[in-house]
């Protein structure tokens, strides 16, 4: 009886559709961002546009001898805590360290500077909690429940899909696609939350410090829906030309990205295919720079 039940459970586990957003996978994913014991020579930092938009696998496939990690967090900003995490994972014994910073207008606001998501993950996932996630929760992915509403969503062609990768990337898709949904959200966000000189100065100081450690720092503005980009430029106080100039004067390098080559599902975040395309473009631009040094 037990064997029959076990076999049936395994069959259901293998044959059933995967959850749209596995809670067990998500728990391990975020814990691994702050409690990974490995070192890397390629770090990607930013907010949700970055952790959904840049795949370390594509980077590693193009730039030889690279071990990459995406350290993006929801609504992530650039404070000392974020850079402490970057420095924690960098392999400073390696002379080929690279940091890619994915900028968004929101990432340089006071709200993003607080980095509430990063801080909450670090505060929560310590000691036994971290051990439990790594050793128990991860094993429960196989048994993640599928709720009835997800079955209906798949049938009618809607839903928000997340695929978590141990390297820090989340491949995301959302149906139906609605790029205009971000316009109202960011109009509200920037009503009382503008570009922060303090946050930008911390970013510049850390770019300068990293370059003095022989780390190459590349920055880019993450691509978005053209109407959202125009809205952000008009409301946020983010001046791309000034930001680019100051980053370069502090030792950083700027990657120009053509927004129209990439598509979003909600105006703000790249779909999986576009995230891979962007990652390949970033890797090729960086590789070209390294070869021409």
Which positions does each model-derived feature cover?
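Membrane-embedded segments
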Residues: 45, 49-134
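Long, positively charged, glycine-interspersed low-complexity recognition regions
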Residues: 234-293
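Secreted/periplasmic serine-hydrolase-like ester/acetyl group-modifying domain
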Residues: 103, 112-213
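Hydrophobic membrane-insertion alpha-helices, especially the h-region
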Residues: 1-16
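Structural motif
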Residues: 41-42, 98, 218
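A structural motif corresponding to the C-terminal end of an alpha-helix
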Residues: 204-218, 246-253
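Alpha-helical transmembrane signal-anchor/signal-peptide segments
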Residues: 15-38
């Amino acid at each position: 009886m037990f064997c029959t039940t076990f076999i049936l459970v395994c069959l259901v586990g293998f044959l059933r559709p995967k959850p749209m957003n596995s809670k067990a996978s998500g728990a391990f994913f975020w814990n691994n961002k702050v409690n990974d014991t490995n070192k890397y020579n390629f770090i990607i930092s930013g907010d949700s546009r970055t952790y959904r938009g840049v795949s370390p696998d594509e980077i590693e496939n193009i730039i030889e001898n690279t071990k990459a990690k995406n350290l993006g967090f929801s609504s992530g900003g650039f404070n000392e805590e974020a850079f402490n995490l970057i420095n924690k994972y960098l392999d400073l014994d390696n002379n080929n360290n690279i940091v890619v910073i994915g900028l968004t207008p929101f990432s340089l606001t006071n709200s993003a500077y607080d980095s509430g998501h990063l801080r909450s993950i670090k505060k929560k996932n310590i000691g036994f909690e971290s051990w439990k996630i790594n050793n128990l929760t991860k094993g429960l992915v196989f048994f993640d429940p599928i709720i009835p509403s997800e079955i209906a969503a798949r049938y009618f062609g809607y839903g928000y899909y997340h695929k978590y990768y141990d390297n820090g990337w989340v491949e995301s898709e959302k149906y139906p696609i609605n790029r205009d949904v971000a316009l109202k959200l960011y109009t509200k966000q920037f009503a009382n939350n503008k570009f922060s000189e303090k946050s930008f100065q911390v970013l510049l100081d850390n770019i300068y410090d990293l370059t003095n450690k022989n780390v190459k720092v590349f920055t880019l503005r993450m691509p978005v829906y053209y109407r959202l980009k125009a809205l952000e430029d008009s409301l946020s106080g983010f001046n791309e030309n000034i930001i680019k100039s100051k980053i370069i004067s502090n030792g950083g390098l700027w990657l120009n990205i053509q927004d129209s080559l990439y598509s979003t599902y909600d105006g703000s975040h790249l779909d999986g295919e576009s995230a891979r395309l962007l990652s390949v473009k970033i890797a090729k631009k960086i590789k070209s720079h390294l070869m021409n040094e």
